[in-house]
Structures are given as C-alpha cells and as structure tokens.
Design a protein with these regions (language model features):
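Short acidic/histidine-rich active-site segments
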Residues: 97-111
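Mid-to-C-terminal alpha-helical segments outside catalytic/metal-binding sites
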Residues: 116-140
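Divalent metal-binding pocket/active-site signature
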Residues: 1-71, 108
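His/Asp/Glu-enriched short active-site or ligand-binding loop at hydrolase and phosphoryl-transfer sites
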Residues: 72-86
Length: 140
C-alpha cells in the first residue's frame, strides 16, 4: 500500500514537469490549486523559474506564505476564506499588493466579491491595481 501511495502522489507531478518546462519558456499567468501539495508545487515552480503565479484559494501551511510572497506570487481569495479561522490567518499574512479576488463559482455557494473586499478591508481599486500589475508583467 505504501508504494502505491507514493506512486499515486508523485505521478501527477511527473506529468506536470512537461507543462512546467513549457511554461518556463512562456510569459503567461498561471493559476494553481495547490491543496495538499503546496510545498512540492512551490518548489517546482521555483525550480522551473515560473513567474506570474496565482495561488488559488490557498489553504496550505502558514510557514510557506513568506516564501511564496518572496517570489512575488499572488493569492486569490474568496468570501468563504474570510469566514473561517484558517482562511483569516492566511489572509492576514498576505501583503495587500499580492491579493486578487475570485468567486470559485459554482463550487463555492458563497461567492460575493464585494463581501470579500469588505471582509478584508480592501477596496476595488487595490484589486484592480494588483491585477493590472500582473497583466503588465506578461505584456513586457
């Protein structure tokens, strides 16, 4: 069973190395859902020099957030994150200039962007500026 689990857990990453190699040569925005693979995925992104990354609905360890931030990666948050203790702790550690919003519709039944902004005390203009900065990075 142990060998099976190791194969099962590592197989998706072996496939993704081809995608990462391709992305390393492109200047694209990459949105990643890193659930239960945050550290491994982060290390792979850094190893392949992938830039312009958005960590979608990040739920990983708080200790990894400073490293993600150091690489200038963004985080997309939604209203549901603002309603849980773990989500609030994550949001507190993200610099405001690296926050984007998302609804995660239709999976997240609570999906109000305006409520998300109100809950974290961030205005639409700040999100617009963050997104504009990300877009301008791929236009260079």
């Amino acid at each position: 069973l142990k060998d099976y689990l190791i194969n099962f857990l590592t197989r998706p990453f072996l496939l993704d190395t081809n995608v990462l190699q391709l992305l390393s040569k492109k200047n694209k925005i990459v949105s990643v859902h890193s659930r239960r693979a945050e550290k491994v995925l982060f290390e792979m992104l850094v190893t392949y020099g992938i830039k312009n990354v958005i960590f979608h609905w990040y739920s990983g360890p708080l200790s990894l957030i400073p490293k993600i931030v150091e690489h200038g990666y963004y985080f997309s948050i939604n209203e549901k994150m603002t309603k849980t203790n773990s989500g609030i702790e994550i949001i507190k550690r993200i610099p405001r200039n690296l926050i984007l919003t998302e609804t995660d519709a239709p999976f997240n039944k609570v999906c109000s962007i305006s409520n998300t902004l109100t809950d974290i005390g961030l205005g639409e203009n700040a999100i617009y500026d963050n997104f504009s900065r990300l877009i301008s990075a791929i236009r260079r």
